[in-house]
Amino acid sequence: MAERNEQLERLAYEYQLLQAQAQLLAQNLELLTLGRNEFQAVKQTLEELKKVEDEKPEILVPIGAGSFLKGMIVDKNSAIVSVGSGYATEKSLDDAIGYLDARIKEYDEAIRKTQEALAKLEGQLQELAQKAQKLQQEAAMRFSVKE
């Protein structure tokens, strides 16, 4: 009986650890998805800019709190893109779009790996729950047999 209780406690502890890991992975997955969506939105904006016929199109520049300033794109043939660690570089629109595509693919791969790891953890959680349920059923059967 004491051994069964120890097994149940050990299973509960393992379950809590795996559940915490799964929660961290789910949060990471959410952050990765947000990052990917941001890169996708920038890419789409640059693709749409290529279609604009005006040489210096007018735009709205967000300044926060839902407020904007009217502005003008001085050079619609290039964009300044972040390359990480606080650095940015000027690229042609096509090069910028290519760079963004590569980053989106990196995000897609990280998302895929995170989803796989999360699915594996969920499978392990399910196995632990089944083991615990089996132990509890065995204990209940022994208890009812003794009565």
Curated annotation (Swiss-Prot):
Q: What is its main location?
A: cytoplasm
Tree of life domain: Archaea
One annotated GO biological process: protein folding
Key words of the record: Chaperone, Cytoplasm
- Is Transcription one of the keywords? no
Q: Name one GO cellular component term.
A: cytoplasm
Q: Which InterPro entries does the annotation name?
A: PFD_alpha_archaea, Prefoldin, Prefoldin_subunit_alpha
Q: Could you tell me one molecular function GO term of this UniProt entry? A: unfolded protein binding
- Pfam families, per database record: Prefoldin
Q: Does the keyword Cytoplasm apply?
A: yes
- Subcellular compartments: Cytoplasm
The annotated subunit structure for this chain is: Heterohexamer of two alpha and four beta subunits.
Q: What does this protein do?
A: Molecular chaperone capable of stabilizing a range of proteins. Seems to fulfill an ATP-independent, HSP70-like function in archaeal de novo protein folding.
Family, similarity comment: Belongs to the prefoldin alpha subunit family.
- What name appears for this protein in its UniProt entry? Prefoldin subunit alpha
Organismal lineage? Archaea, Methanobacteriati, Methanobacteriota, Thermococci, Thermococcales
